[in-house]
Each structure stands twice: as structure tokens, then as C-alpha cells.
Amino acid sequence: MWEQPSIIAVRMKKPNTSPQASLKATVKTGATAASRAVSGFSYSRPFFEDLVDTALKHAKKLGATDAAAEASEGCGLSVSVRKGELENVERNRDKSLGVTVYLGKRRGNASTSDFSRAAIEQTVQAAYDIARFTAEDPFAALPDAADIAVPAEQRTDLDLFYPWAITSEQAAELAMACEAAALQTSKRITNSEGAGVSAQQSHFFSAHTSGFRGGYASSRHSMSVSPIASSPGKGQDMQRDAWYSSMRNAEELASPQAIGRYAAERALSRLKSRKIATTECAVLFESPLAAGLLGSFVQAISGGALYRKSSFLMDSMGKQVLPKHIDIAEDPFIKRGKGSSPFDEEGVKVQARQVVEAGRVQGYFLSSYSARKLGMKTTGNAGGSHNLILSSRLTKAGDNLDAMLQRLGTGLFVTELMGSGVNYVTGDYSRGASGFWVEKGRIAFPVEEITIAGNMKDMLKGILAVGSDTYNYGAKTVGSILVNRMKVAGS
């Protein structure tokens, strides 16, 4: 039996995000209500409202049946370092006005980054001309008035905007601290692919002639590092891994020291990886990878795949597609949530709902267009899903990673996947993978250069357990997932 280095025992403990270990102890964002009024944007909300109204009025003047317009602006700072030296500083700022014009059941789209009056009129004219020569689509239309989100004064503030007034020098200092923490974890951390800090923010305003008006500002900040571990001696082994933290509010980011150490622990744990013989066994997906399984499920029950009849979950409404202990909830109203929004991209009202209850599909993910194509009602998912939480009714508070490894017994614990490898028409699943071979509930040795394969229908129905080691990956929250059986192709 391969002897685990002591660092393996703590490798899967995610960085502490308590105030003591958070970025709040390192740098202040200054994200008070007063400071948020000074956003760093070049354009104000009233300016965007006037821009959009001008576009809509011109569309109606040209003879449009209906029209929609959206003005947006994004800006930010990205800094990367490597081996203690500044590598790249990038400031980005972009703006756009998008216009959609309807002529009956014909639709045209155009956009511009020029906010002058002449450019606005030219853009509307371009959208109008495209609509004139586009074939009719019986399902093309703005959302029904009954589905429009409530007026702005009735919407809940979801606390999505925390501008980070950080300089490039401060960002570089944080990135260097993150990389240094990784390099100082062990003498076997011998190199680095670099560390980075990003501060991004955006705002928009949209409206259409069915009565919707709305917009908001949001932010997304992150810090990451990718260290390289190596083992000395004959047949030198080198392994890379990475970790990151991403939040709306920079003060809630994990500290650079926690991110760096954890990334280093992950890289170290992969040293002396081996190949394994081809087999069939149970597979435990690490929680960040489990979010990918949830994403594949969402895509399969989304409107575009369903009306094109290109989904392995066609006609699944009300059917048992997951075990009875599995629930999936969607909640657009989580404060500071990465998938939170008071309305979808069409201005349609959103709702908290059960997408899956006791393993049965209770709802799809539909825009107004895909809903019409399917003869259903929109679910407020133009632009995709909102915050999703996958849970098991069997999960207990103590079902952490150690408990899930015990539940796995002997099998494969997957911590990295390569390639896309999902056929959404058939459900066939095949991806390159690496991770750890587990025997009797304990990690035996790291493995690499393997392929795991199965069918998504069988994988979903074969979920035995979901861990309490929940991880928020983007807009998806899920613990590690144990699947009963998959093919593992090795040497």
C-alpha cells in the first residue's frame, strides 16, 4: 500500500473563508453604500436609459411592430505574476448598445459600441433592414406582458455590486503573496505557472416595447494560483494543480495565503501518479466536478436542446430521471449569489422553484422563445439557469469527504477532468480524468492518464450519495457525488 504523505490528510479541506482567513484581513474594498455610488463607470444609469429610449423611439418611427434595446458597460483590472515578478497588467473597458427589431414575426438584431445619436439611428436601421429580409418565425416575439418582471421599485436588492478600488500595484502584491504561499508550502513546490488577481464590474439597462424597464450593476472578483510540484531523483515527476476564489465582494475572497497553500497541497498530492488497469468501479466526483454533472443535466433539460430534439432527456417532465433522494432547487434571489438576478435576459420575472423533486423533473429551463416552440410557458431562464442547489435527502451533516471516501470503499476518486466528452443527443459520456485510487475507504495512490465513460442517464440514476462538502462553483452548489458504476480505461 502506498503511504500517504501527511499533506494528503488535509488536501481536500477547502480554504477557510472565515473573516480570519479572508481577504478582508488583507485589504479593504471600501465597498460601503457611499463608495458604491462612485463606481468607476464612464456612463450613468440615466444616460443608458436615454440611450435605450432613443433607440426604441427610432425603431417605432421606422415602423417596427416591437423593439428591444440594451446598453451596457464593463470595466476591470487583471494582473498576473510569475515567480515573484510582474508578468501582465491589463485594464479593460467595453461598452455596447444592442437593438432587436420586430416586423410582425420577422426579427433583426444589430449592435454598436458608438453611443452617438447618428450611430444609434444607424444601428436601429441595420436591425430593421435585417428584419425586413429575414424569414418569418411564428414564435419570434417579445415576452408576453403577463410574464414581465415587476416594476423596479418592487424588486428586491440582491446586493450584487461591490466595486473594488484596487490599484495594479496592490493587485500584484496580492498575487505575489498568493504565489509565495504556494512556493513556501514545501520544497517540492519548485515552480509556478503564475498567480493572478482580477477585479471586474459591469452595469446595464434594458427595455422593450412590451413595458419592461430594468437594469443593475454587478461585480465579480477573483484570485488564483497554479503551482508545480516535483519529486527529485531518477524519473523526476512533475505535477501541476490550481485553486482560486471568486466572489461578488472582494472582502469575502479567501486569503492569498489560504489559496496558495491549498493549491500547493493539491499539486503535492498528485506526485507519483500511476496508471491503472482498465476496470469498472464506483466513481466519486470531487465537489467542483460534481457541479459539471449538474451543468450537463441542466443543458439536457434546457429549451434549445428540447425543441431541437437533441437531448437525451426528451419528454422527461414528471419522469424519474434521478434517484428518489435527489432534489434540485433554483433560487435567483440569493444575496450576492453568482447566479442571482431580479429578472432574466428578456425582462421576464424569475422565481424560486424545485426543478427536481424526489428525482422527478418538475420544470425545464425555458426562455419565452423556447417555451413557445414547446407549447409551454417561459420559466424565466433566458440567458441560462440561476443559482442551483443539488441535495440529497440522505445526506447528513457528517458526510464530509472522508465519509464519502468510506462510502466509496474501493474505486476511483476523480479530481480533474479533461475535454468536453458529453454527447447530449445520446447521453454518452467519456472524459479524460485524473485523481486517486481508493481502497477500503482510504486514498491508496494518485492516478492519471485514464478515461472514465458511461451514459448520463445511467450516471444520473446511479447517484448513490451526495456529500455535505458542498462547494459553490459559479452559480451551482453541490457536494461530492458518488456514482455506482462507470467504465475506467487505463493501461
List each model region and its residues.
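Dual-mode signal for accessory low-complexity, basic/Gly-rich regions
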Residues: 155, 300, 314-491
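Short acidic, glycine/serine/threonine-rich loops at helix termini
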Residues: 78-84, 154, 200-220, 235-243, ...
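Conserved alpha/beta core surface patches that mediate binding of polyanionic ligands
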Residues: 77-93, 196-231, 359, 414-419
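N-terminal alpha-helical targeting/anchoring segments
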Residues: 77-132
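Acidic low-complexity segments
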Residues: 13-16, 23-52, 56-58, 62-78, ...
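Short beta-strand elements
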Residues: 90-103, 214-245, 356-357, 433-440
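Residues forming anionic-ligand binding surfaces in small-molecule and nucleic-acid pockets
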Residues: 104, 147-163, 230-250
